[in-house]
Each structure stands twice: as C-alpha cells, then as structure tokens.
Amino acid sequence: MESQQLHQNPHSLHGSAAASVTSKEVPSNQDPLAVSASNLPEFDRDSTKVNSQQETTPGTSAVPENHHHVSPQPASVPPPQNGQYQQHGMMTPNKAMASNWAHYQQPSMMTCSHYQTSPAYYQPDPHYPLPQYIPPLSTSSPDPIDSQNQHSEVPQAKTKVRNNVLPPHTLTSEENFSTWVKFYIRFLKNSNLGDIIPNDQGEIKRQMTYEEHAYIYNTFQAFAPFHLLPTWVKQILEINYADILTVLCKSVSKMQTNNQELKDWIALANLEYDGSTSADTFEITVSTIIQRLKENNINVSDRLACQLILKGLSGDFKYLRNQYRTKTNMKLSQLFAEIQLIYDENKIMNLNKPSQYKQHSEYKNVSRTSPNTTNTKVTSRNYHRTNSSKPRAAKAHNIATSSKFSRVNNDHINESTVSSQYLSDDNELSLGQQQKESKPTRTIDSNDELPDHLLIDSGASQTLVRSAHYLHHATPNSEINIVDAQKQDIPINAIGNLHFNFQNGTKTSIKALHTPNIAYDLLSLSELANQNITACFTRNTLERSDGTVLAPIVKHGDFYWLSKKYLIPSHISKLTINNVNKSKSVNKYPYPLIHRMLGHANFRSIQKSLKKNAVTYLKESDIEWSNASTYQCPDCLIGKSTKHRHIKGSRLKYQESYEPFQYLHTDIFGPVHHLPKSAPSYFISFTDEKTRFQWVYPLHDRREESILNVFTSILAFIKNQFNARVLVIQMDRGSEYTNKTLHKFFTNRGITACYTTTADSRAHGVAERLNRTLLNDCRTLLHCSGLPNHLWFSAVEFSTIIRNSLVSPKNDKSARQHAGLAGLDITTILPFGQPVIVNNHNPDSKIHPRGIPGYALHPSRNSYGYIIYLPSLKKTVDTTNYVILQDNQSKLDQFNYDTLTFDDDLNRLTAHNQSFIEQNETEQSYDQNTESDHDYQSEIEINSDPLVNDFSSQSLNPLQLDKEPVQKVRAPKEVDADISEYNILPSTIRSRTPHIINKESTEMGGTIESDTTSPRHSSTFTARNQKRPGSPNDMIDLTSQDRVNYGLENIKTTRLGGTEEPYIQRNSDTNIKYRTTNSTPSIDDRSSNSESTTPIISIETKAVCDNTPSIDTDPPEYRSSDHATPNIMPDKSSKNVTADSILDDLPLPDLTNKSPTDTSDVSKDIPHIHSRQTNSSLGGMDDSNVLTTTKSKKRSLEDNETEIEVSRDTWNNKNMRSLEPPRSKKRINLIAAIKGVKSIKPVRTTLRYDEAITYNKDNKEKDRYVEAYHKEISQLLKMNTWDTNKYYDRNDIDPKKVINSMFIFNKKRDGTHKARFVARGDIQHPDTYDSDMQSNTVHHYALMTSLSIALDNDYYITQLDISSAYLYADIKEELYIRPPPHLGLNDKLLRLRKSLYGLKQSGANWYETIKSYLINCCDMQEVRGWSCVFKNSQVTICLFVDDMILFSKDLNANKKIITTLKKQYDTKIINLGEGDNEIQYDILGLEIKYQRSKYMKLGMEKSLTEKLPKLNVPLNPKGKKLRAPGQPGHYIDQDELEIDEDEYKEKVHEMQKLIGLASYVGYKFRFDLLYYINTLAQHILFPSRQVLDMTYELIQFIWNTRDKQLIWHKSKPVKPTNKLVVISDASYGNQPYYKSQIGNIYLLNGKVIGGKSTKASLTCTSTTEAEIHAVSEAIPLLNNLSHLVQELNKKPIIKGLLTDSRSTISIIKSTNEEKFRNRFFGTKAMRLRDEVSGNNLYVYYIETKMNIADVMTKPLPIKTFKLLTNKWIH
C-alpha cells in the first residue's frame, strides 16, 4: 500500500525517502571496488533486500506491458570512430512515446547538458517527473537477428519482469565518479540490462536495441551532470555524445585493475609459509604477485617484499627473521634460496628411506621400517640446490653429499673438496675406523631389496656400492670422511669408477665409492645426469637425452631398480682397497710454505693458479693439500682483518667492452707518517679493466709534477710494451687528479678522464679494492717478516708481483696471462723477509767477512736480481749474489711455526738459482761482480746514527738462531765488528754497560749488583767508570766518535738536586745482578716530583750543587758550550727572553731563604708526600716522599727502546707484580660506577607550577611566585611570543609540531622570585629544528682573560642585562604550544612566533640575532675562535645569554654602546662601573671586587654562605677547621657496595648536589680544589660511606675557606708585552688502571686565569710520557688564549711553558726524529716538538717544590698545599 502511494504521488517524501533508502543501499562491509559485469550479482545482494521490502502488485506498481511494442532492427552502418559498438539509429519522439518512455522522463527544471540536444534525446514531460522508483523495461532486448514479430509475440519468454528499480544517486563530485558508476551498473543490471554491460575487455553478450540505448543514455545524463564528470569521460562524450558504453567499459576496466591491485597487496601482506607446500610453488606465487603489480606500474622493492615474506614465515623457517633483521640490503632471490635450502633439508631429514616413485614423475615420502639401514643424508646448511632447468627425478633420501663433492671431476676426485661428507643413519651406527672394513649388522627384509640390482636414488649425489667387484681403477681412500646424521664415522674404503655396458652397446662410466656399511647399492641419478642419462619413470627406462633407450628399470616395492648385469666387473684386489695406511703422500710441499712464498694469497687463488699453470716448476700434485682449505694463517688474520666486504656491482657495465689496456683505474694511497725522508709516503696504483693487470709507483708527495711524471711513465710503458693506447682513466675527485695540469695532459693526448660522482667512493670500487688488498698484504708481510715499517712499499711491490701472477676467483687466467706474458717462475721468488746472506764484493778489509746479513724483499724490476734489505747499511741493494739463511723462520715463531721446517723445500724450489757460494762460483773471478750488484734500489736511511733500538723485535736479528727469550749479546762471527757496532746489532753497544734492573729493582725499590758473571762486560764497565772525567764535556768525548750520534741525554742523568750520574744502560738479555745505593731512573723515567735527600757522592756532585739556583734556569742538560741558552725556539727576540723574565711576577712559593743544597731544610718546610702505586682512584698517597724517592718506579730504559714493549716483556718474563694491570674482580661495581658517571643528569634546582603555586603552603612565597607568573605572562604577550588571533584545535595539528610547555620558578641570587615560561626542548622532535645551529656563550677563560686585561689597563667594567632576550629572536619553524594554565584551554594550541626558552633552536636564534645587531649597528667584530667575545677599537663585550660585560678605557664608549642597545632591546644597567673606589660586581656567579689601577678579587663568599647550609651537610661538627681539602694516604675501599635501591638513589642524589656545587666553585675560581673534585666526581655512582665522608670533608673545607678569594694585582710597572704562561704537571699512574692525572695552570701577566685537572685519556707507560701528555694538552689552549690576548690587547706577547720534567724538555729540545719513532708516545712527542718550534714557545724547567700545578695532580700535605697556593688564593 505504501508503495502504491509513492507511485501515485511521486512528489511526496521524495527527498527524505530517497535519502534513507540510498543510505541503506551501501553496506559498510561491502568492498566498494569489487564491482564488474561478472560479479554484479554478489554486489547487488544487499540492495535487493531493500527493494524486496517495498514490493507491490503488478497491477498497481509494475509497468503495464505493451503488446504492440516493436523493436526496430539495428541499422547497418559503419562502426563509430571510437568504440566497437554499432551506430544505432536516432530515437524519435514517436518511438519514445510508443515505448512508454514517459516513465523515464525527468523534471524540466534540471539543467540541460549540451549532449541533451542529440536527436536521440527526448525531452521529458515537465508534468511527469522522474519517480523515486523506476520501472524497468518490460522486455529484454532481443538478438539483432530476431524479427519484430518474434519480439512482439513472445516478449515474456525472453526475460522476467522485475519490480520497480531503485535509481542510482546523483553524482555529486568528480572524485566520486568511480563509486557512482558501480551503483549505476547495478541499476542497469536490475533493469534487465546486465547482458549488454561490457566487461573489462570490452566484450558484451548481445547488442542493445534503440530503446535500450536511449534508456541508458537518458538515465546516465539524468543522474550524472556533465560538469561533474571526470575529464576522460568528457573527452569520450565530446567525441561521441551517446557513447555511454565506452565509458562503462573503461570504468569496469579501471575497477577491475584497482580490484586486482588491492587483492595482490592483500595477498602479499598476508603471506604465510610453513613448508607445507613446496618452496618452488611459494616462490612462483610471490613472484607472480610482484610481477602483476609491476605491470600496473607498482614496483615492490626487494626489501619490502622480504619484510612481508619474513613476517609470514613460521616453523623451521622462522629463524630467518633474526638472520635478516639487521640486514639493510636484502635480496629477494637470496631469501628464496634460503627458504628453498631449508625446505630441501627438512624434506630430506623427514624421510627415512628412498622415496616411492609414481607415474608422471610424482613421488611421495614413504618411511622405511628396516631398523639397521644406513641412509645417508645432508645435515649441513650448505646443501646444493639442484638446477631447476634440469629434469628432476624422484628422490630417495638415503644419501647425499655436499655440493662440493657432487661437482668432482670425472677423471680425478679432488680429495680436499670432500674432506667432510655428511651421511645419516637411522640407528646411529658406530662403525670402525676409517681404514677398517667393518661388517654392518643389518636385517633387511627379503621383500625390501631386489637382489643383483642397484637402487636408483635421486637424492644421492654420489654412487655407493658395498662390493668392490664392479669397481674399476680403485684407489685406497685416505682423506674422504663420511658421517651419518649422528656424526658417526662411516668408512669409505676406496674410490673408483663403475663401467656400464647397456643393451644397445652404449658404454659409460661414473664415479663410485666403496663401503660395506650401507643397506643398498645406490645409483645416483645426479651422476647419470652428468653423462646425459635420465630415468623415465613413465616408461620405466633409462634413456639418453636424445630419447635412446639404454636399459629398463624395475619397480620393486616402493623403489626403482637397475639390474647389475649392465655393470662390467673388475678384477681388483682386496688388498689394494683396504691397504689405506700404506698409501702416504711423499715429497709434497707443505701448504703453509707455498702460502708464504706466494705472498699469503688465498687457497682458491693458489689452487686455481696451479691448475692453470700460472706458476711454473710447481704442480698441484706437488703440494700437500690436506686441510689447506681450512688452514688459518695467523699473519693473514692479523694483516687482512677487515670490517666487511666491498659493495659488489659498483662498476658500470659499459666498461667491460674495452680492449686490454684501454681503460685504467687509478687511485692514490697515503700518506704513511713517521718515515725517513728517503722513504716514499704514498703510492699510486693502476689497474687495467680488461686484464686486471696492476702497477704501483712510489711517491714522496702528491704534487702535480710528481703525479704527471707517473702518468707519463705508465702511458709510455703501455704503448711500448703492449702496443696499446689508453683511452679512459677512471679516478676519484681528489685535487691531485682534478688540477689543470693533469687535465691539460689528458686533453692533449685524447684521454677521457672519468671522475666519480661526489661522495660516491663505491663507483671507484676497482681501485679502492686494489689498495685495500695491497695494504692487507703489506701489513701481513711486514708483520710476518718483522721488518721495519719504512720498507712498506717493498711489501706492496712484492704483493703486486704476486697478484699479477695468480688467478683470481672471478677469472680463468692470471693478469699476466691475460696480458700475454709468461707465468711466474716460482724459482725466482723468495718469501718476503726471508733472511739471506749477501756477498760483500768490496769489504773494508781483506780479513773482514764477505757476507752481510739481509732480508729478501722482491724481485728487481730493472734486472734479474733480487732486492734485498741490508740493515747494517740501512740500504736496499739489487743483487743476485745471495744465499738463503737456513733455520730461520723470521717472526713466524711467535705463532708456533717452529715445527714447520721449510729449508729442504726451499732448496728444492730454488734449485734452479745458483748462489755465489755454489761450487761453480769458484771458477769466476770476484772482479766480475758489477757495480749494479749494490746499486741502491731506494736510498732509505732511518738515521746515520748508531741508534740502540733500530730493531725492536728479536726476530729482526738476521743471525739470531736461539729461540729462547734471552737474546745473545755477542756479535756473530760472520759480521764485521765495526759494521755490527754501527748498523746491525745494537746490542753490542750495550755490552759496554752490562747492567740490568732485576725484578726487585723495578717499582719495588730493588738493589743493583755489580757484574760477576761476565768478566768481559765487567771490565768494560770498570774502564768506563775509571775514565770518567770531572765535567760532562769530557764524558761526551769518550763515548762516541761523533757527539751528535748519541746526544747528551744518552750519556748521563741529572738529578733534580743537581747531581749527575752515569747513564746506566743495562742489557735486558743477560741474567746479571748488581748492587749500588739509591738507584736513579733514566731521563725517560725520572719522576717529575722526585728529589734526593741523600746525594750520591761523585766527582762532579759538589760543583754542580754549589751552582744550582732555586729556579733552575740552566738545567744540567744544557750545561755545555753548545747549550748555554735554555730557550727552545730561538729567534730574533730570544736574546731578550730569559728564564727570569718568564718567572717574574708569577705567584710561586717564596723559597729564596732556603739553601739549594740544604735539602734537609727544604724538607722541613715541605713535608714528605707519600705516594705509592695503588688501585685506588685517589692513589698515589703513601709510602714515598715526593722529595725523597729512593725507589725506582720503573727499570731504566735504553735509548730508543719502546716502553710499552718493555712493560710486556717484564710482565711475561720478570713476573713483576707492580706492573701488572689492576685486578678488576673485586672492583667490578666500582668500575661500573666510575664509567657511568657520564650519564648523570643534573639536579633540578627549579620548581614546577604545582610546587610553586598550587600546593605551596608558604603563602608569602606563593604570592611572590604568583606575581612573577603574571609578570612573565605580560612579558610574553608584549613580545608577541605567539599568535593571539587564533587558537588551533589540537587534533588538527601534526603531533611532532606540538611542543609541550611548562612554567618553572626559582629564586635568584639577589632574592627576587622569577617565573619563566619554557618549552620542553628535551622531548622536541628532531624534525622541528636544525641540528647544525649552535648556541654559544662566552667561555670562562675568555671572561677571566678580559678581566685580567681590564685590571692591567685600567678599564671601566659595565654590567648589563637584556630582559627576555630569547623572545627577540624570531622562529622559522612552524611550531605550536599549549596555552598557559590559567587560560584553561587544554585542547587548544597556540602558534609560536618567537624563540621560547627551552627550544633547541632558541639559543642559536638569539645568538645570531644579537651577533648581527652588534656587528651591524654597534660596529663590533667577533673575535675569531672565541664565540660571544666582541670588540671594536674602544670596547670589548663578553656575552653570556642575556648578560653583557663591557670593558673600555673610556666610560663614554660604554655608554654609547648602551644607548644603541636600548634602541632595540630592553636593556638594564646592573652596574655602570663609575668611580675610582672599590666596585662590587656579581658577574655570572662570581663576586668581584674591583678597584681600578690597584687590584681585583674574585670570590663567592655570599653565595656559599647561603647555599652550603642548605645541603644538609654537618658543617663544623666538632668546631675544628680543616686546613686542606684532603690528606695523602687515604684510599677508597674497592669492596662491593651492598645497599638498598632506595638508599642508593638517595645517596647518589646527594652526591650530585654536593659535587655539582663543588664543581661550579672550582671551575669559577677555586682551581686549587680541582683535583679533589675531579676524583670524587668519578665516584658519584659509588656512594659508599667512605666516599661520602671524603665529600663531606671537601664541602667542609669549602665552608671553612668560603671567604678565600682569587687575588690579582695590577702589574707594575706596566710592561710593553703581555706574558702568557702555562705551568704543567703530571702524576704518573695514580688513577685506576694506571691512568695518570694531569694538571695545568694558566697565568696572564702573573695572574691565574684558569686551571685544569683531569685524568689522562691514555694509559701512560712512564713518568715522561705522562708529562708529555700533560704538556701536549696544555699547548692548544695556550695558543688559543694567546690569540685572544693579542686581539683584545695589541701588545706583543711572550708565551712560556714551565714543567718540572727535565726529560720532557730534553725531548722537546732534541732534533733527533728517529729516537722516538718506535715509542708509544712518539707521535705525541714529535707533534709537541713541532708545536713548540712553530709557535715561538719558550720552555723552561721549574723545580718541583715551586710547581704550583702540583695541586692539580695529587693530594698534598697541609704545609705543601698552603705553600703552593697562598700567593694566588687567600
């Protein structure tokens, strides 16, 4: 009834009803894309439910049938120009009326599109608008061939009349067209037009009639306004206005495509694989999906595909997730291979018997029941995947071997490739040894095996037989090992061939193994396939690849069998097969020898080279290959250690098209530092693209001329030797390649210079990999041979020769063979560094030996000789007159190579070379030796001096044959004594002073005994002492032919008190004890704080002591006629700079009233400082006096001896406990605590909003904070901090752009309460700021320097403050913050306009803003290297965020700057600095009292008085004041700390507060406390009771001395120069793990402006090294301060460095570069020497008792502490 009313009154409820029905027609769970002509029934299922609820009777709602309806025939006209459908005739109004078209009319008010003017369009009647439900066409359209009569007679036979159809909704936008089309297609289907809707291929089931065409046309234009159609639809309709079907066809096609894409993505995202299906099927499925997406222009990367696949793996495949988790370069093919590998392994492991063959090559797994059957299978993950291109047969998984074994050559089995075969056994067979033929115990069902047949097995990679009756050419097996699945050995007795003679006369042979321990004779289909024979299980035959039938196969049980009648029996002897032990390899060269001789090349290259005959006179069979593939060379592991492989495929493909020597790759390596000038520091390498031939050329520099000469040489060489022209040279973009000179060179010769792109080193892979390979070889060869580093290029040269001669794994020929050259002659090669004896054809005397020991390097380029290094001459020679030194394995003995004897092998390999001592040599005259035998290949000289330690390793002694750790000290008979003294055996020089420090004498105060075991040595030492003169100069003349050779420091040691002792050298290689009193360490090891109270009585003692001043301005090292001036860097002004001028005005202890020789009086004023080595972090506080050191901390070192090596030798040979590293077992918690100190967060000193206001019970304080809060809000609004015009919804903004904000409250030093609105920059997203921007503030040293200069120059000091400084800087990024709490807008956001405090970029923005203003508006310039220090001709400004300190000689100049600043910023004058009376400042926490022209005092008394009582530390508990911050002799207990977690956190928090405050005080001005603060700061995370007590004592001392100030006085008279001095000191090994404490104090014109105390970053091995480390740390800051002083004050500057280490001064002064080359600290010492000489730095000695830097490195007694600090802080 309801439907009738709707039909009768179409205008009623039109809008609402239609809307409600439409909303029900689109189910939420329906896929909107799954619509096409083929699946419309499913899509329409839900909508029909809606229509069915409003069905009406045919008489009231259905369209009445028109029995007079006649459908016209389609016109026979050509098809339209767009589309395959026939052109329909136009519909006339009469036809439309005759077809009841009035039902489909539309209101006239609808806008008429231009295609409505078509003749086929009939304008609807305005009195009958389109109803809500449209009746469908009464009949379906007939086939075109039907006549009108047929249609009119049986209209109901063609279609079923449907009820009213729900019309589609009107198209509302262009974007919704695809969705609208789906509803429109459903509408047409419901209108009985589904069979004319084209599918995605444009195909339709029948042609439409005119009436149907008009119906579609009119409904389409009625519900799809033209202006809302997509562009592609408009284009179709503009060409043919009625071509609606083309639109529908393309729409369906698009929907199908989108639908398939979605299905593919869903399938790819939901991939699952557990091995239930084959891996190949899974791979094909995934690849098909990816390929289909690729065809739709959707590329799925390998990484994404791998991630989706890995997500769905389960079962045994799940472990691949962890394997690929960290990989960034995942390959899909590699992942499929891994899956296939696991699938095959699981399939093999799950089968216990051969598979059951079925027709059509199908098979299934059938388990076996034989209990004792031996079924072999693969258990390794290196399973070889069968090539899918080959025909696959059914697998019987009873045997399989590794892929290497399956590839064995038919003619010969390479035993090294089959050393480990894995087999499986169901019952874990325990078989006999490999050489014994054991009898297996097995029970085989008679129905299970077919007698006299071979079981055909596709799973076995080798054929196995139980009887040797059919085995031809059998050889006993000695290497092949096969194990079952339980890894039990299964012996293989023999290997041989099976010969087949098939029925058609075809003969073939396959490899087979003989073992009696298997259940069946197994025939491998893999072996048959190698002979082009396959098994056809459809016809049960063996066939050739051409289809020829060879033999039938029989199916018996579950398996297929081949009769043994086709096997040809053999007559082999059992004795031959089982006699394995008697077959031994004889006269074979050991692989390690060949590995060494061929430059430590890898196994595959050597083996392949021998197979290809790339090395002559040596065959593959001549080498013992057992375990060669697994051999690990220690030198290779060390020398070739690398992080990862080079990225493959970086070379472009087109490079492969060049001919040999047309395309070169080149690269430069270097520099190699610390080499003599004659040694090359670089090399340039070239690689030919085609042949991979390599060249290397040495370079001493990278200048254009040097590079050009090399290119000229290589091009000429290639042109003349290979008749080729270089066309392209590939290089990187280094300046040595991109210069104009080389570019012009290439242009003139028509060579293309191919450069890599910017920062793309991977494109230069060929040259980069070559350099890496050569350097790996170089390091390996040098390490193996033990030769010095300056021979590094010889190692590179040797490696190049070898690499050119070997076959690489990727090539079939070596580079020499590619180039057409002969292979490498093995008889011309010696192992790199092989000891040899070279004939000396021109000896100094006829009675001198004619042989010189040397080391073979590489074959000569320019002759048939060999390049040999002669250590005695420091030269390399090109000669053929040498003989190999036997029984010497160079440095290999350290890796237990002693058991390898290669001498006989070397003799056989080099038998073709005749040495100069061969018998036939005697017939030649010695005059026939040409001069070229000793022509210098490279004049490499380390130094002409006879230095003591040219060879730090005992293996470098070419004649050292004894393998014991004790070296021989006598020169060998074969060497001239003169030569050995100067060049080859430095130990002979040591024999003159045969002394050694025994284990009790090092670190433990041992005694020294005279030599009684070596008379010769003893007499030498006695004579030397007897000839000792009374002056140092006489001693110098006695010790050397050339004074420069040895230097002063090699002759004597000078005690700090002025006494001189002979330079006591000792021979570490003789077990000699000797004794004397008060042993004195050498210069290198002298403690910087040692002073003797019991001087040794000697000839020169009194004279020296009497002339020693308090400040030693002329140290004993310089007391010679050649060293009268102690300054290090003499220049034009050095005459005016003396020690007195440097030491003048320094706040040093006043010791002038003490006699320098009266050491006992000195010790009265400066108490003993006990120091000992300890594991304590406060170590160095016990047992010995710093002024009375009678115990040697370390045995004296000889000249040029590497200290770190001495320490290792001592640990290994001397067993000295004092040098052992600290035991960490009992200190594990302490160590962890010390290491974790860096992660300590600062203690919060501010209050949150709830703490300051909401829950604050102090009403007065709360009111002050409220007032501060409103004041801050007002300031923020005044500065337009955020956009107040608009509030943003929190949900509409990207979360990472939202910055959390908060209010923080604190009380300032002046008592005012401060509130600040800040951003939470700690959780700010990295994308919201530029990490490269820097926030700078003035350095404290810059402030102290400026204050010091202001005092000396009577400057006015003005202090300013800029309110809300950060808010003056705009913000560039789009950021939002939450409104302040009082606004109550929790869900709203404000957009920031200014740089709010707390943002990461705010500091940098403010710095750039104020910097720009000061430079542009105030005419200031920032001092280079010192941020926030600005100056002009009159004013200096130090900027610290919003605080400004102005310094000027004229106060008006300061006022002028203030006036300019106030124009832009809210500037407050804190202190103008007027008047001549004392003015007090509070500058950055420092309380400064300043009176112009008189003094300046810096302290923190008020601040400390206020803050210290709030720390809850019991101050003055007993009323006793501490007079020093700490006392020597206190040690921190290292026992584990057992404490509750809550108590631990509480104590750590307390330590943070205490040490934080102490650090602030020490950093500002209390430099005397820095050592104690630094030590306790390392124990913040170890808050034991002892550590807390020591911290309390430090706080107590700060409280007791809170009134102390850093005192500066104006320099009077004013000097024309500024003097900048640093005083340095170090305390050796007094920190955990023998780390040293270093300290430096900086003084400007006598005023202490800064100090530093820290633990050395490196573990020093001697006192000298610690002092050098301290000095090297001080010089960079000294130079920076020098630059600052010169910028702020234009006076000349004198820079000085004071240290109490004479050995350090000696090192700085020395010009000998070789002395420290092999030392651990040699690099730092040589750099220090360069810095001193290059910066005009004056270095002087200062006595320890006057070194005020001592307070920075160790705890001192009260008197000493006061004496060193009372002049500069009191």
Curated annotation (Swiss-Prot):
Residues 1353-1491 form the Reverse transcriptase Ty1/copia-type domain. A motif (Bipartite nuclear localization signal) lies at residues 1193-1227. One of its GO terms (biological process) is proteolysis. Residues 1-89, 355-449, 1005-1038, 1057-1205 are annotated as: Disordered. It is found in: Cytoplasm; Nucleus. It catalyses: DNA(n) + a 2'-deoxyribonucleoside 5'-triphosphate = DNA(n+1) + diphosphate; Endonucleolytic cleavage to 5'-phosphomonoester. The capsid protein forms a homotrimer, from which the VLPs are assembled. The protease is a homodimer, whose active site consists of two apposed aspartic acid residues. This is Transposon Ty2-DR3 Gag-Pol polyprotein. It comes from Saccharomyces cerevisiae (strain ATCC 204508 / S288c) (Baker's yeast). The gene is TY2B-DR3.
